[in-house]
Amino acid sequence: MSLPSRLPAILQAVMQGQPQALADSHYPQWHLAPVNGLLNDPNGFCQVAGRYHLFYQWNPLACDHTYKCWGHWSSADLLHWRHEPIALMPDEEYDRNGCYSGSAVEFEGALTLCYTGNVKFPDGGRTAWQCLATENADGTFRKLGPVLPLPEGYTGHVRDPKVWRQDGRWYMVLGAQDVQQRGKVLLFTASDLREWRLVGEIAGHDVNGLANAGYMWECPDLFPLADTHLLICCPQGLAREAQRFLNTYPAVWMAGRFDAERGIFDHGPLHELDSGFEFYAPQTMQADDGRRLLVGWMGVPDGDEMHQPTRAQGWIHQMTCVRELEWQAGTLYQRPLRELVALRGEAQGWCGQTLPLAPMELAFDLSPDSTLGLDFAGALQLTVNRDGLRLSRRGLQTAEMHHRYWRGEARRLRIFIDRSSVEIFINDGEGVMSSRFFPGYPGQLIFSGATPVAFCRWLLRPCMVE
């Protein structure tokens, strides 16, 4: 049974909130962000008939996680984006507490969304349904209803279907928590998208010898890359280490051999996907040209998000830039989308101590004994030395200083700056650090160190959103 539509309230919220958000000095110039309300996980990242689609978790009514819809952008070039109609709203009994994350595939000639319908009960319990919706001729979506109930042996925390086709069959990975409150990744298979069979657990606590791996794994994504398979996911409850897994919840990758017929993923250790303050729920897709592309949410759930100053302007959070994934010598590399060079203005050489803070790209090489400091208008500090990189900033809730680390020899940096974010690509993508910061404007980027650094910079044009 359909629930009362909240579309009129959503339209009113967008009309009232958009001018305020766009006027905010922290609203991004070339990253994707909500016109109002809260954005989180990227969903349904795909390319169909040559056009890219990026859906996203969106609460258009408030800057909190209460009313989860699927927003929708599309693009011909990953630079110029168009707002599409809202794809999903929680207006059925089986998704009444949120249309949670999922993926998109082409099925029976139509773009089809695979998502989790979240249902909460008055006694504090919950359940989850894996659901389908198919695109209509006018670009809206028609819900087909649930296709998979909660599997036996797992709590109501089963979500985020990532679906793909392989060797004539459909496969799906789901994030899950078993009844012993241990995080898992489940593998399902089907001849179509309607009747799924559980193959087994392919990753998580007590799988492949992995102990103490947290109480819930979410946002899984399993895909081939070069001569290996990679599983990306977000374990909740993973133990923090001295300089790793420091966010409330991290995003990780592991490489290994995937046997679809036997339902086995024989993988190695967990690696942090991004070492910055804000990165979560990444999703990948394979473009028509063969590239494996990734986009992530530049946020972390249950962190300092409710203290971000943009909430006062009616919006919160943004996406990362799109990244290209490559597998080289046993390491995952993330490189900035090559199309981003089209946003560059004229190249400018620079060797000095201060720059006006603005949306831009910086690139420079480092010698093995380099020591370097960058201060982002007092809101974020980067330190580079022979041990690696450290990002530092004060908490939004307290004045306590917090740090994030990347360890290794930094030989080259590419730094992408927007009005309230930075993404630092280390050694052509061997490491990445993504973080939000909220400076006062006008602000300065201040360099320090024993040796002046010569670098190239490009001011970045806006990423157009229609």
Swiss-Prot record:
Primary site of residence: cytoplasm
A GO CC annotation given for this chain: cytoplasm
Entry annotation: catalytic residues: D41
Enzyme Commission code: 3.2.1.26
Amino acids binding substrate: L38, L39, N40, D41, Q57, Y100, S101, R159, D160, E218
One annotated GO biological process: sucrose metabolic process
The keyword RNA-binding appears for this protein: no
InterPro entries, A to Z: ConA-like_dom_sf (IPR013320), GH32_Enzymes (IPR051214), Glyco_hydro_32 (IPR001362), Glyco_hydro_32_AS (IPR018053), Glyco_hydro_32_C (IPR013189), Glyco_hydro_32_N (IPR013148), Glyco_hydro_beta-prop_sf (IPR023296), Suc6P_hydrolase (IPR006232)
Top-tier EC class: hydrolase
Gene Ontology molecular function terms on file: beta-fructofuranosidase activity
Pathway: Glycan biosynthesis; sucrose metabolism
A Pfam family it matches: Glyco_hydro_32N
Reactions performed catalytically: Hydrolysis of terminal non-reducing beta-D-fructofuranoside residues in beta-D-fructofuranosides
PROSITE patterns: GLYCOSYL_HYDROL_F32 (PS00609)
Localisation per UniProt entry: Cytoplasm
Keywords: Carbohydrate metabolism, Cytoplasm, Glycosidase, Hydrolase
PANTHER family: BETA-FRUCTOSIDASE
Family to which this protein belongs: Belongs to the glycosyl hydrolase 32 family.
Function per UniProt: Hydrolyzes sucrose and sucrose-6P, but fails to hydrolyze any of the phosphorylated isomers of sucrose and other phospho-D-glucosides, including maltose-6'P and trehalose-6P.
Protein name (database record): Sucrose-6-phosphate hydrolase
Organism of provenance: Klebsiella pneumoniae
Gene behind this protein: scrB
